[in-house]
Every structure is written in C-alpha cells, then in structure tokens.
A protein has these predicted regions:
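Positively charged, small/polar-rich N-terminal and surface patches that mediate targeting and assembly
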Residues: 1-112
Length: 112
C-alpha cells in the first residue's frame, strides 16, 4: 500500500503517469499539512495572518509488492520538477494485510 502526500498542482501529472504504468485505482483526498515547508504569511484587509497548514493531496494506492518500486519511481518522476524542492511531498509504504472486493467477495491480489 502506498500513501503519497503531494502538491495539488501535481495531481493530474501523477494520475496520468500512473495510468501509463497501468495503475488505475487511486483514492485522492484533499488534506492540509506542513513539514519542513512550514506555512507562510498572508495579508488580509491590512492584517497579517500566518497560514500554518498548506493544501496537499493524499493519494492511497493499493498495489502488489512487485509494483511498489515502479509506482514510487513514477510518483517521484511526476512530482520532482526542476531538481526538487522542499514541499514536493512524501511517499509512505506499508504492508497491505488483506483486500476484499465487496461486490464479488474476491480477496488478495484478485481484489486489486
């Protein structure tokens, strides 16, 4: 299982790149967060506000163990532009214990 947190502007390029390697099942959620990128200061009606949490997109991709490296390389390639910079995102890989396709009852890799 891969969970990637990326910049919203990279979502379409990641989706297209994943489709090119036959990964078509992705869950995308709009989230907010910060890491080393931190927040930024904005002006609104003359007053300064610190925006700590920045908009991000969290992708969840259920794949087989054999697909992990290729999916990671694909996401990095679609998100790392101009040599990469703070805020490009992170990728987390976890073990997927079980998958069940609700409609058919299929389990394991057949359910992916």
């Amino acid at each position: 299982m891969i969970m990637a947190v990326i910049q919203p502007k990279r979502l379409d390029s990641v989706r297209q790149a994943l489709a090119e390697i036959d990964i078509t099942g992705v869950t995308a959620t709009e989230v907010k967060g910060f890491g080393r990128q931190k927040g930024h200061t904005e002006l609104y009606r003359g007053a300064e506000f610190v925006v700590d949490f920045l908009p991000k997109v969290k992708l969840e991709i259920a794949i087989t163990a054999e697909q992990v490296d290729k999916v990671i390389d694909t996401i990095v390639g679609a998100c790392k532009v101009n040599g990469g910079k703070i805020g490009d995102g992170k990728i987390f890989v976890t073990n997927l214990e079980q998958v069940v396709r609700i409609r058919t009852g299929e389990t394991g890799s057949k359910a992916l």
